[in-house]
Amino acid sequence: MADKTVVLGYGVTGRAVVSALVSRQEKVRIVDENPTQNLEEVAQESGIEVVDVTKGFSWGEVLKDCSQIVLSPGIRDDHPIFASARDASIPILDEFDLASRWDKRPCSAITGTNGKTTVVTLVVEILNQSGIRAEAAGNTDIPLVQAIDDSDVEHFVLESSSFRLAHSLNFLASPATWLNFAPDHLDIHRNLDSYEQAKSKIWDGISRNEDAIANLSDPVVARHAPNGCTSFGTTSSTCRVQNGFLLFREEKVIALDDVLRKFPHDLENAQAAVATAIRSGATQEACAEVLANFSGLPHRMEDLGFVKGVRFINDSKATTPHATISSMRAISEVTLILGGQNKGLNFGDLGVLKPNGVVAIGEAADHINEVFQNICPVQIAKNMQEAVEKSVAMTRSGGTVLLSPGCSSFDWYNSYKERGDEFRSLVMEHGRKVKDE
């Protein structure tokens, strides 16, 4: 009898999926292509079947007695499990599908190449301010299958990556918001079209067209937006910036002078958050309260202050050229620390930038040097300390040192957070040294 669920990948999401299935008396088989001792210990203690990929196996054998497959985020589009599942007519699911099957509480969903975490955070805060108990889940530290264990939550706000959307079958979220689109994750998706199609699935589960919240200033998003959607990003959108105010429909939500963060991308995020929150049941008063006090998240245009007249900004979360371009548009007189591990993206787009200087880091340093060598001075740094030292030497008083790498962090670090933390620490150390001089 085919009654087992194969869980591919045993990271944060995989562990949560296995735990949720086991707690519901489901039979589970774990496949992890980078097994750890911890996984072996879990298998021994719980009696869960684990496939040891180091000892030789076939996907046909792995899928024997299997009724469904749940993928962890980040499985490549060309992974052999897809062909094997198709041949055996076994459905492939995402954790969102399981959670939607088990729990019917309302969900909002946010996707986009950039800005997801910020908008999710804003929507959660606005809903809570409105008296609706909300929690973030999904592409966060808490997968949805884990979040639904909290019976006090009234509304889930889901950070929805392309990895999750690509393999969801029956995921229901309404409203659902698409922030923007730019090349990303081409080391995972077959091509740019595959990435776009994954993102567009955000609207598959909406209840009505008004619950599709779309950035109409982005041509890719606009192309997929249904008629009657709730829009933002243009001067004629449902939610827009006009005459010094942020409006929803024709009502003033908040004066721009009262919004704490006013970079162009901040105002776009604010529009998305207001539209999503109001469609989720929030009040305009709550929107205004949150936007007036929201100072941003770490590693996202995080202002570290000034040292001898030079401003330092930590934008380590910028892991694509698109994100770096967006950040650079917000400031001038910039020395840019750029680089890391490329995700199969085209750095040529960065050529539109006009920084005062570039410090190139990581695996992509040589490629970045090629892009900017005829635009501005470029130096290559072997580590972050050297990058900070060289950027300081290149920057005059009144200028800004911006860490906005445009790449993932996995050449030097375990995460963009670790990269940003080191940059922040080095800037603080630089400030102390200058003060002691």
Predicted features along the sequence, with ranges:
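C-terminal helical cap/extension that packs against the catalytic core
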Residues: L39-G47, L345-G399, K435-E437
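Beta-strand->loop->alpha-helix junctions that form or flank phosphate-binding loops
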Residues: D32, T54, L93-D97, L216, ...
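Phosphate-binding loop of NTP-binding sites
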Residues: D3, F57-K64, P73-L216, V220-C229, ...
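Residue-level detector of alpha-helix initiation sites
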Residues: V12, R76, N114-T118, L267, ...
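Nucleotide phosphate-binding/pyrophosphate-handling subdomain across enzymes
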Residues: K4, A16-A20, R24, L256-P355, ...
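Residue-level signal for inorganic ion chemistry
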Residues: L21, I69, I110, N139, ...
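Short internal beta-strands
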Residues: R29-E33, A212-L216, I337-G339, K354-A364
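N-terminal leader/targeting and accessory segments in enzymes
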Residues: M1-D94, L98, I361, Q379, ...
